[in-house]
Regions:
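Interaction-mediating elements
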Residues: 1-133
Length: 133
């Protein structure tokens, strides 16, 4: 069920590069969280530069206009080591696939209880789900 929200500056990523980012994110989710290929939900936001605001550097990292802000929401229960591995896997795959600096990825993971998600019909289909990875 992971939902990935990919935010980039308008005009910095063409369709092919966005597809590479998208594919790399999904590949990392499949690899690290063991998400099946058909479990695919992504929203891609291209924002004007004046609506994509960020500090130029933080904690020794330097951001460019290629910065990707990525939010990933999934059902809670995965151990800390798995979440840390996911951050690294996403970063490595996106950097390699889309020619993005490893500095230019701000990733936030959100874990929510299964009862807080409905895939339709107002039902919490994963209310009693146990995380796989």
């Amino acid at each position: 069920m992971p939902l990935a929200k990919i935010h980039v500056v308008e005009g910095r990523y063409d369709e092919a590069r966005i597809a590479k980012v998208s594919g790399a994110v999904q590949a990392a989710l499949m690899n690290t969280l063991r998400v099946p290929p058909e479990d695919f939900y992504q929203l891609i936001f291209e924002l004007p530069k004046n609506q994509f605001l960020h500090t130029p550097s933080l904690v020794g990292l330097h951001y460019t206009d290629d910065l990707i802000i990525l939010d990933v929401t999934f059902i809670q229960g995965r151990p800390k080591q798995t979440r840390l591995a996911l951050l690294k896997d996403i970063n490595t795959r996106v950097a390699a696939a889309a020619d993005v600096s490893p500095d230019d990825m701000l990733i936030t993971l959100y874990e929510v209880p299964g009862e807080n998600i409905s895939f339709g019909q107002g039902e919490a289909q994963r209310a009693n789900a146990v995380a796989r990875a």
